[in-house]
C-alpha cells in the first residue's frame, strides 16, 4: 500500500480541522472563541480557507459549523475576503449545484471588500486583480447552468430546492455590481469585456423555453448600472451664498483701461488671450465679451472728454491718445484675433455688436462728438473683412440713420469714409502712415519727420506718433536711436558746435516729452532699447532723466549702519562726481565749493554760566511777545534763524508772517533791517548725539540711490553765480566757438543755477521785487533761447525740489516770464519749439503754482456715497491708505475702473506696496456683507492684478495664503475671517489667482522664442523690467509659488485634524474643480496631485466625493488610478459613499 506524503502546512490545517470538529461535537464553548489560526504557527490561511469551504459545502447540504466559522474568521480578519473569493473560484467540484451554493459566500464577501493597507499603493493593484475574475466566474457559472435546461430541472428536483440553481450566482453578481465600491472598481477593468459577459447571461436567459422574466429583468438592470458606473462622473460645484450673484461681472470692462492706458505696449494677441482667459474663468459668453470690450472702450473715451468733480484736467494725467489708439487700432485687432483663433464665432460677435449698438447708443453719441468721427461705423469698416458685408451693412445702416436724426451728430454721419481734417482720428491715421516708414527701413526719414514735430510745435501729432510707437512695440527701438544721436551731439566731433547744440536740444526735448507724458515707460529700457544695459546709460540724458523726471521711487536710498559706512559712501559719491565732471570737461574745485556752502562760523566767546541754550532776542520778536493779542502758539513759531552766510533769511512759515503783518505797523517793518545788521547772533548749542546713533555732519546730506548709480556732473557755486549773472544780462554762459565743448557741461550747471534762483526767492519771499525778478527770468530765457532744453531741465529740477514757499514763488516767476517771453518772441527761430516745451511742462507748472485738489475732511463712506470723487495723486506720490480707500469707493460705485483711479494702484505697485491696496480692498469686500457687492468686488480685484500681473499675482497670493491658509489661521476665529459668506468670496479670489498664475506660467514657457533654462536658480527676487533674464526668473517664481502652495496644503492636511483651514482647502479644491473648463483649469488640475484628495477623504470622508477625485485623476496615469482606488476604500471604511 502506497503511503501519501503530507507536507507540514497541510498537517497543521488538518490538525486545525480536527480540533474544530472536536470542539463542535463536544459543544462545550463557542467555536469562534476557542480556535483561531493565530494559535497554529505556520498555518496557511489560504489552504485553511479552501478546506473550510470544502467541508462547509460537501455534498447536498451545507455544514453550518464550518460555514459560520469561516465567516467569523473573515469578520475578525483572520482570513481575508479575497482569500474566500479565490477559494470559491478555484475550488474544484463535480457538482455544479454545490458550486452555485458557494456563490453565497461571494455575496457575503461584498461587504468586506477593502484594501489591505493604505500605506502602499501596490495593494490597490491586488484589489483590482480579483474584481474581473470574480464577475467572469459568476457570469460563466450562470451560463453553464442555463446551457442545459433539462439538467437544470433535474437539479431542482434532485435537491428539492424551491428556487432555480442559477439564483445564487445571480444574486452574488447583483450584489457585486450594485455595491458602490465593487461597481466602481469594475470600471477600472476592461469595462467592455464585463459588459459582454453580462450580455451573454442575458442572451442565455432569453433562450430558455420557460423564460424567467424577473431574472432577465435583473440582468438587464445590471447591464445598465454597469454602463452607467463606467461613465465619467461630472463634478458640479455651486458655491452657497454667492451663486445667485454671478451674473454681472466687471472684469472685462476693467481690463480695457488697463490695456489701453497702462499696458498699451502689449501685443493684440496677448490682450485677446488675456480677455478670453478671463471670460473662460468667469464663464462669460461670447456676445457678453464683445459687449463689455466695447463698453469699456467707450467709457474710457467719454471720461477723458469731461471734467471730473474736484479733478480738473490740468491736475490729471492725459489719456486722450491712449483711448483713441486703443479704440481705432487695438480694438479691431483684438476682435479679429478672437474670431480667427476660433475663440469666438462670427455669430457671437454679431450679437455682441447688435447689443452694444442698442444699449450703448448714447455713449457712442457722446464719443462721436468728442472724436468728431462716426466711431462705430469706423470700427465696422475695420471688422468687415472678418465679419462680411452681410453682417456689417445692416449695423452700419442702423447707426448712420440714427446719426442723421440728431443735429449734433449729422456732420459726422459720413466721417467713416471722409475724415474731417485735424481731428484726432485724422492725426492718428497720419501717425500710422509715418510710423510705417520704420517697417520699410526708412529710419532716417521717420527720424526727420519726428523731430520736425518738435521744431514746429505739433504736440498732438507728436503724441499720436508716440502712442502708435508704444502700441506697435517700437518705442524702445526709436528711443535708443535718438539717445545715440543725443550722445553723438553731446561729445565733441567734427560737426560744428551750433549744429551739435541744435541736434542735442531737439533730441533731448523729444526724448523728455516721451518720458514725461508716458510715466509707465521704463527709462532704462527706453534708453537701452530693451532689457539689459548699454553704454547709453553713461549719457547725460539718462542720468538727468533718472534723477529729475518725476516718478514714483523704485529704489530705496542706501541706509548706512554706522558712521564708518556713511563716510565710505560719501567718499564713493565724491569720487563718482569727479569722474562725471572729468567726463564732460568740468574742472571746478568742488572741495572748496563745499567749504563755501557751509562755512565754519566761530562760536563767540560769551562769558556766561553753563547753560544748554543761548539766544539773543530779536527786536521784532520782542514786539510780538509783548503784544497780548498774539497767541502762545504764534510765539513758539517765531525763532531767530542762523544764516551761515551772514545774509538775511526770512522765515518760510506762513502763519507768523500773517501775524506780524497784522500786528506791526508799516513803519516798523522797515526798521528791523538796520537793527539786525548790528546784532551778533550766537551759535545755538545743540545736544550731543547719543553714542549708539550714527554721527552725521550737518553739512552732509543723506546719500541717495541716484548719487551712487547715476551720478551727475556738478559745477561749483562760485561758477554758478558767475553764470547766473551773465544770463541775467541775456548772454549764454557757454562758448559757441569752442570745438571741444561737451554739452553735458552746460546741462550740469542747471541744478546749481536753480538752487541760486531758489535762494534768491527764499531771501525775498515776502517783499520780492516781482518786476525785477520777472525781468531777470525773461533775460535768462533769452540767454537760453538757442537751447530751450535747458528751460525744460530747469523745470524738471524745480519739480523735484522739496515743496517750499521759495519753490512756489520761483514757479510763479517762471510762469509769468515764460508768457512774457512767448508774447515778444513770436517771430523767433525757436518759437514753435518753445510752444512745444510749454505744452510739455504745463502740467508741471500748474502743479508747482496751484495747490493740489483737496478733498473735504469727511469719512470715506460718507464722502464717497454722497458724490463720486476721484482722488488726485502726484506724479511721484505713493498714495496713502486714505486715497486708496477713496479710489476703491470711486471704482466700486461705478463697477468700473477709471484710469485715473487705476493710476493710484500703478503708483502703489511701482513703490512695491502691493500688500497695502490688496489688504484694504479685500477687507472692504468681505466686510460689505452683500453677496452681489462681494462677488463683483472680488472680480474687480482680480482684474486689478493685470496692472502688474506677475508681481501682483504672487504678492496677493502670498497675502491670501498667510491670512487664511496658514497653520495657525484656524486659531483666529474671533475676527470673522472664516465667516461662511466671506470665506466663499475669498475662495473665489484664491481660485482666480491660482488659475491666472498657471495660465501666465504656461504663456511664459511657450511664448517665442523657445524657453531654454540657463540659470541654476534656487532663490531669486522679483526681477525688474530691464532685467534680460526676467523671463526665466518669473518662470522660477511662479513655479515656486504654485509648488509651495501644494506643499502647504499637504503639510496642513497631514496633521489629520479637521479645522477651518482644512475646510477652506476642501472648498478651494472644489472651487477649482467646479470652474469652467479652460486651459488654465486643465493646467492647474494636473498640478494638484490626487493624493491630496485622498488625504482629505481620510480626515473627513463626507467632505469630498468620487466625482471630485475624478477631476484630479488622469485616467492614463497608473499612480492616479491606484490613488483613486485607495480613495474609494477610504470612503468604504467610513461608509460615506457619495458617487
UniProtKB/Swiss-Prot annotation:
Chief location of this protein within or outside the cell: nucleus
Free-text tissue specificity from the UniProt record: Expressed in seam cells and all six vulva precursor cells (VPC). After VPC division, expression is restricted to descendants of the VPC cell lineages P5.p, P6.p and P7.p (at protein level).
Keyword Cytoplasm attributed: yes
GO cellular component, as recorded: cytoplasm; nucleus
Keyword ATP-binding among record annotations: no
Motif (Nuclear localization signal): 695-701
Any one Gene Ontology BP term: defense response to Gram-positive bacterium
Key words, A-Z: Cytoplasm, Developmental protein, Differentiation, Nucleus
Subcellular location: Nucleus; Cytoplasm
Role, per record: Participates in the inductive signaling pathway downstream of let-60 Ras and the RAF/MAP kinase cascade to regulate specification and differentiation of many cell types. Positively regulates the fate of vulval precursor cells. Required for induction of the P12 and excretory duct cell fates. In males, it is also required for proper formation of spicules. Does not function in the signaling pathway that promotes exit from pachytene. Plays a role in responses to M.nematophilum-mediated bacterial infection by promoting tail swelling and preventing constipation.
Protein name: Protein lin-25
Gene: lin-25
